[in-house]
Amino acid sequence: MKTKFIIFSLFAALMTSCVDYNTDSGFPKEEENPNFEQNEVRLWVTNQNKVYKLTELPIDYNDEISKLVIRINPSITYQTIDGFGGGMTGSSAYLFTQMSTEARSKALHSLFDPKEGIGLEHIRLSIGASDFSMGLYTYCDKAGIENFAVPELDKRDLIPVLKEILAINPNIKFIASPWSAPAWMKDSGLLNKGKLKGEEVYDDFATYFVKYIQAMKAEGITIQAITLQNEAMFESNVHPSMIMSAEEQATIIGQYLGPKLRKEGLPTEIYVLDHNFDIYDYALTVLKNKEANEYIAGTAFHGYAGTPSVLSNLTKAFPDKKIYMTELSGGEWNEKDEMKTLFYYLNDMAFPMIANGGNNFMMFNLALNSQHGPLTPGGEFCKDCRGVLTIDGDEVLPELEYYLLGHFGKIIRTGAKRIEANLQGMFPEDIKIMAFLNPDGTRALLAVNNGGTTENITIKDESTGKKLVYKLAPSSVISLLLK
């Protein structure tokens, strides 16, 4: 009996020693972490069976112990986010102006209101006609830069809509791009195809941007950024387009546009390329030009060829430059299974774009009609493109791209920082995550499960120690906002 007592005493002492060691370490056991309160968490869900499409739901707390843990750490920060959004093309603006006042207000609130809508805060504009416009025009159709003037179509459609949007959300940022220089500056003498005549028009071309920025400012619209040419290596015979080599772009920025913006005291940022990932070496060429580099804020990309993985080369070579996604269109070519397309957008485009240093994410047309237009007169390109909204009269249909952008815009504000987010445990490869710290201190988490099983996951905030256990359904996307 005495022997048994001694053995039991030794075992108890060892167990006490282990407990004391864990307590002294300052790290409580996982199950001892406090839970988030209901009023500290907001959740939006989209799932395969379409029961939920960016639907806000209460958190269904459970106390099951999970071996899968998502840890977010707001003390480790990465790049700043400039917003999520899309293109307000001439066609999009026209469709909004054709709506009744009440219907238009509701549609615009659904896009730009951070409380009632999805909180988009980044809009791309075309300087003159694009492939989705109500006419063929620039801001200086008559030869001579002294003839610069805001086009009547933009006075009628675009500018009133932009002012209405700013009244809804004053935090909107605008980036503007020409699809073509005025025809009199080009060797083709046309808005479609061709290139600039050469150095003889570089000064006027640079002044064209300065006058545009000043004209929009006079309307109460601040242009945060510009690119020199939409899809600089693409030439179309049926809609406005223009070829511009990397060397030419560097010359114009370094010797003409950059100095002019600085002289005029305009803080508008310059982004280069504005074309697909597969020709990222174009951006490298421009950035390596020392004369141009000092005026360049970053690079802009489209998602029609190549992959965002190449962006790691840019962030390594030029860590001080931003990276924008300025265009990606949805369309009839997408999978008929909407969740497959949503997972493609997230896993192949948005997540790797941001993980590799991207500062925003934008789709193309914010609105088109059910006939995939209106196209620019004479236009034959992208007849099956889809807008973020489909608008016919006062009828509005949010498309898949609306829910994609909403999963970001609902929880991430301009000025947020991407933060460290890690998966701990034997997570399936089908689960992807991304986390952010908002300027107001709230934390945002996106999680994607494109697998076939429900996963019980503990989500832990390292800054507060708080946690919640959540059942992540198969084939679903969630957006969490944590206070």
Model-assigned labels for residue ranges:
Residues 31-68, 174-176, 207-215, 219-224, ...:
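Substrate-binding and catalytic surfaces of secreted/luminal carbohydrate-active proteins
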Residues 24-32:
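Membrane-proximal, proline-rich intrinsically disordered regions
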Residues 54-223, 255:
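N-terminal catalytic cores of secreted or lumenal carbohydrate-active enzymes
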Residues 16-17:
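C-terminal motif of bacterial Sec signal peptides marking the signal peptidase cleavage site
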